[in-house]
């Protein structure tokens, strides 16, 4: 209401800048946490593949010993240790076979080890957001993403829950707060006066990004690789978010 009060204007602008930087820093921290999740998932997938390959190899050795009529106690202990280490990364179920081998499945039923063969997991980008990670398997020459519900328990399950629930909720809450506050502040700013002669309504002080509709990577594309269709979104009332 007193645009000529320059000292007050500078205080308000400084505090507004500080607030904007705080929102930006919070968003950057969420991005950093997400990058850490991706890196940890990649390491976990490599560890799982190493362990499942080890189980398949020991299965082969056990089958040979059992076939000769002997009991491979040391090999059984070695396999039990590998399964225990695997369980630290993902919840698994096991099924023994008559030949002494052990089949290993993730809790959702995906086969990891069957006899002397292991199925490798792979790190993949999320279908809707390439900055997020997902777990996949090779299926008929293509990567098939596993639902996170199949990977309950263990380090991988915890990382996926943190990514898909905690970080997603935190990012959404931060966006809602920023949009609602910016809208209200700009509305209040418009009720004031600027330094023009004659004075006019105050200009918006804050700006925030428009909402983004993320397309599935499997959506139809044209010959140039661009999505055929798109969706745009706007915020009609930020306070209702």
PLM-predicted stretches and their roles:
Residues 1-241:
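Structural signature of extracellular appendage/secretion-system components
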